[in-house]
Amino acid sequence: MRWLSSTWLSDLSCSSSSVIEPSSSLPAPIQWLRFILLSPCPQRLLSSTVDVLFLLILFFFAIQKLCSSSSSRTNGEADITKPLLGRRTRTRTTGLFKTTVVVTIVLSFCSLVLCVSAFFTTRTKLKLVDTLFWLIHAVTNVVIAVLVLHLKRFASPSHPLTLRIYWVFNFVVTTLFTVSGILHLLSDDPAAASLRADDVASFISFPLTAVLLLVSIKGSTGVVVTTSNVTAPAKSNDVVVEKSENVSLYASASFISKTFWLWMNPLLRKGYKSPLNLDQVPTLSPEHRAEKLATLFESKWPKPQENSRNPVRTTLIRCFWKEIAFTAVLAIIRLSVIYVGPVLIQSFVDFTSGKRSSPSQGYYLVLILLIAKFVEVLSTHQFNFNSQKLGMLIRSTLITALYKKGLKLTGSARQNHGVGQIVNYMAVDAQQLSDMMLQLHAIWLMPLQVAAAIVLLYNTLGPSVVTTVIGLTGIFVFILLGTKRNNRYQFSLMMNRDSRMKATNEMLNYMRVIKFQAWEDHFNERILKFREMEFGWLSKFLYSIAGNIIVLWSTPVLISALTFTTAVFLGVKLDAGTVFTTTTIFKILQEPIRTFPQSMISLSQAMISLGRLDAYMMSRELSEETVERSQGCDGNVAVEIKDGSFSWDDEDDEPAIENINFEVKKGELAAIVGTVGSGKSSLLASVLGEMHKLSGKVRVCGTTAYVAQTSWIQNGTVQDNILFGLPMNRSKYNEVLKVCCLEKDMQIMEFGDQTEIGERGINLSGGQKQRIQLARAVYQESDVYLLDDVFSAVDAHTGSDIFKKCVRGALKGKTILLVTHQVDFLHNVDRILVMRDGMIVQSGKYDELVSSGLDFGELVAAHETSMELVEAGSASATAANVPMASPITQRSISIESPRQPKSPKVHRTTSMESPRVLRTTSMESPRLSELNDESIKSFLGSNIPEDGSRLIKEEEREVGQVSFQVYKLYSTEAYGWWGMILVVFFSVAWQASLMASDYWLAYETSAKNEVSFDATVFIRVYVIIAAVSIVLVCLRAFYVTHLGLKTAQIFFKQILNSLVHAPMSFFDTTPSGRILSRASTDQTNVDIFIPFMIGLVATMYTTLLSIFIVTCQYAWPTVFFIIPLGWLNIWYRGYYLASSRELTRLDSITKAPVIHHFSESIAGVMTIRAFKKQPMFRQENVKRVNANLRMDFHNNGSNEWLGFRLELIGSWVLCISALFMVMLPSNIIKPENVGLSLSYGLSLNGVLFWAIYLSCFIENKMVSVERIKQFTDIPAEAKWEIKESRPPPNWPYKGNIRLEDVKVRYRPNTPLVLKGLTIDIKGGEKIGVVGRTGSGKSTLIQVLFRLVEPSGGKIIIDGIDICTLGLHDLRSRFGIIPQEPVLFEGTVRSNIDPTEKYSDEEIWKSLERCQLKDVVASKPEKLDSLVADNGENWSVGQRQLLCLGRVMLKRSRILFLDEATASVDSQTDAMIQKIIREDFSDCTIISIAHRIPTVMDCDRVLVIDAGKAKEYDSPVRLLERQSLFAALVQEYALRSAGI
């Protein structure tokens, strides 16, 4: 570095003779540029020019303002618009203002002192010039100080733009002065022994001007104006916070506090004393909250006329350009000081070798090293923190924007993206962009950092650097190609992981059906297949990353070997300073080589995410113009559609419903009827504006309420679901419970209306969910009610009560559109709309439509056919002289209509010739009148939930340190302790080889070996050591990868096996989101992060040990400082980890509710929009986002709090070591050992931080192992197969079932649900099971399938006690059609025959019998036709028929029907019943039904009430006597009669 001795470094003159040095090898232009930037004379000229320009501009603006004020006073207009009495205001200042004032005053004082000093001490020739320079600078700084102080008086929220620009230029000039001063101190010029005034000024001014630079970027003055009404500055970024809130101290922290993370101290103190809980973590600062960011994002969204192609990217840049610029400045500051250490190695080596001009030079070197390391550490962690904070703000902004968009999407757009994909936009793409912020600047910083390194290496090694460039280029290309390969592998890995997660989610959602069908093995194998594909890509991905890591860790030693070989060949002298400066620069270059390719890939992924988000955010929204809505409109029409044609597809002109013309008057009840798939629900959707309007006009008068066919229940309390955001009105609330028949439910539920409803209403019966939905609608008191098949899931009595008390009672006077399959209610509606093939084919009153026949006649005929079964039973009772009647007077109905062949039988008379006795006029029945009224009322009015207690448990959360058992479990799962021992061995051996190479370099470059230096031996030995090092790092990397993969696969199989064989009660009490988080986030941590972190921790600690060994070996007094500082490190770790560990746990806990609420809202968006509750749901989303991000924010703060302190300790150890080296005599410490020690010590701060941080990181990630372990220890249900007790292959061969005193409770210490049930069912019998909602009907089926184990009694089927059988042997022998038809994503074939046991011929035969052959055959893919998630592209009726097809293929001897036809119309019901009667004539059938006709042709009927078998006999015999069943039949008949 010969150029450091140039005279122009200290010459204040601008003579050209100082510029060009003939001896220099640099070109003349480069020497001129160097002179202009680094010589004091041009620097002073530049500084004075900036000062003078600033003063002139300031003077110009002052004159202009003075003239303007004078003119205003002359015209008397200055105060004309001001109020006579101003509002009371108070001005306060934050730490930012105080810091700015202090800095400007200090700069002013220093400038004045230097001005006076220059006048009295400068030599005569330059006294005037020197004094004038400092005078101009002093005047400028004084003016700035006065200006800043006056900002408080004028209550200015932001600094003038002129001042902010000046501070930026002043920082640049001061940086040039500082660099020049450092070079001056390092030069060989004898004048460097004494400090110049310029050097002193620059060293003092540099940190101060850096502070002002940050202030200029922020823009805010820190002055806050508080009025009597509003406590917020007009335009300030400082937001005043309510004192009562537990707001993050970051909001009110001073500049110093933010700089050194002092604002984190109170929270860390709390966490150290006791484990943190949710309430102790402060909320976000107001400027960081989601609601403010959402408003900002919306205001910056490109206007339509801008025609932006990338609106999301454009908006994010507009919102956060200041934050992006600030992090860029921090990155540049870090880059400017990162190479100071390596440059100083040569100076230290020269100093200790005797080339010292004065003792003070050594102290100057230590001081420069200390300042450089401090700036590096501070800028690094401020960059990390602010980048993470920026990422957090972007994620928060995107989540709220995506959520708001999700509430506006059309049905077609929502289906195109899919609920799962929309959730991925929020969970994956937003996170991708957030994570990108840490790597954003690496893309343009990497070329600068490498270029700086090459320049330094060239000045050190000369032409030998060519080999370095070639080697680095080769490594860079290898890493780039490897990273691209990793990206491909990662993409495939994510795709396969998504498939595995989708299959897992599907399994969890429909676990009850899977257990009923004994498909656990099938789904286990299915998920394992997805996992095997995922594991294949995971292995490729991890081994590829291991290859990149090998190259990165080998870079310093590999490039050093190439470079030194070239240097020796070219005859370059290698001394200690040159060698260790080179190796240190190579170590620093590891970072950009590592980060740049990944940054490029991350940028590419971010651009893909932005493209996906652009497509989503630009998706079509529901048009407000689709429906004309008006409040308090004139006229009698409440709902009207004229010439309406509607499509579900925004781009398709093919209508789903067309030629719609109808109107419903205010207060009318209009029923919409039709067969399955006729368009009834679509008609309601068109009224709500949910469909794409192709033509026509839709008009709705007033507010709307909507009750969906498929219940949408929120995860919350019953009360929350009913209130739906409205305040509690107790009298109205109680009345709503009454009319919706929920009073008894509230009484029985353990917590009443505060009972928590599980995910998707899992702890409620179908009827309870439907009634809660209805109660929610009724409580809203809307004008127009759209009810979609609300009676399908409730029994006859409950349905009648709801119709009378609610529909015709509480909602009387409201306009109601009721979709229903219950023909019974149609007598009492004002208008009936009959639909077929997407059109309204008939419209009118009941009498009119019945007389016309056609479609409505067919519906009534189907209903009448089913009623004949009821009346036939009644006729039998009549024939036995047992008259049936009711205390209620019955109406006779006589309808005249022409009889036609095959027309429905609709004529009713009062003649006793008719066998339909239940429809005759009232007559007293002595036996029925003797029936206990209380028992009837209790039976008819009871709605006992089968399990009303709080099912959803709080998530288990460990506190304190992760136990040693968790570490032991992970470490020993694959190969016992030997696995971890090998990891440590390879790490220690590799580090030892690196130390050997460095010791060899020190030995060969020592002064005593200068004469006997043998280049061949030097290179040969170094290359051998380098090769050994590379082999060891290969072994370590690949072994850690293998160990991690094996352990991850073991854990996955354990948790999958545990889940598949978990009892149903586990899934009832555990939300699927909680399970999925284990299968996704926690499994990913075990798959990828933990293995490499363990390897890295071992490496970091062995590296740290090597640094301490080398440092203490040559600067042994340092050990006295290392011991206390080491203890301080350990204390900091424990202090930090206590809070960080809990924050990580809380982050996991608060993240799931954000995802759950997002997906829940998208699933129920029709309901939300119908009630106009979008603002309430957006607010809830914001609340959950803030709750989660506050954990993220404070966790990031704690990370940088720790990192800054640990790296600072490392820097102090380094500087203390360097101080001892310069203090020790040169005959005690050798120059080569100084170089070796410094080359190790320069990385001490980083290694120390990463060693501690990664160990904390592992502990946080070990929480994932802890959480997985919780689910691998789930108590399993009974054995899957019992070899000693296998039933015969043809079992059950008769179908005889005997229950002996069977008792069932769902969980210990809960009431019995079945209370001693004893019944006997003969083979081939058809048993109908009836009872009120929650009476225990479904529990009966569950205990027969052993989804819940009996608490007492026996169940004998064909002579075998089912509790002695394996679960698979039991369940696989039964057939069941569940209440809710479940289809899995896939094809028709995979749904009807999941286990692939049957031929295509058998499948087609089954489809033909269940009336679906024509539907499937009409599709191009036939049996491979697509079935969407949950069968959404198939109607409810078609889904039920497919479920019937499964049972027909299975041909089980015992068949269970669990309200299988509750959601279909009478025609479809009749068809299903006919198929079952014909195809299962010799089978035992147990049918649970709400529809009485379904059980009237059964051999026997079981009446269950409150868990007891109250009646069990044939329908005729039960009707012959005073029975509960008779009362139920009578109730149903009365309802059908329209009473």
From Swiss-Prot:
Keywords: ATP-binding, Membrane, Nucleotide-binding, Phosphoprotein, Repeat, Translocase, Transmembrane, Transmembrane helix, Transport. It comes from Arabidopsis thaliana (Mouse-ear cress). CDD domains: ABC_6TM_ABCC_D1, ABC_6TM_ABCC_D2, ABCC_MRP_domain1, ABCC_MRP_domain2. Its EC number is 7.6.2.2. Belongs to the ABC transporter superfamily. ABCC family. Conjugate transporter (TC 3.A.1.208) subfamily. Residues 896-916 are annotated as: Disordered. Residues 639-862, 1297-1531 form the ABC transporter domain. It is an enzyme of class 7 (translocase). This is ABC transporter C family member 14. Ubiquitous. PROSITE patterns: ABC_TM1F, ABC_TRANSPORTER_1, ABC_TRANSPORTER_2.
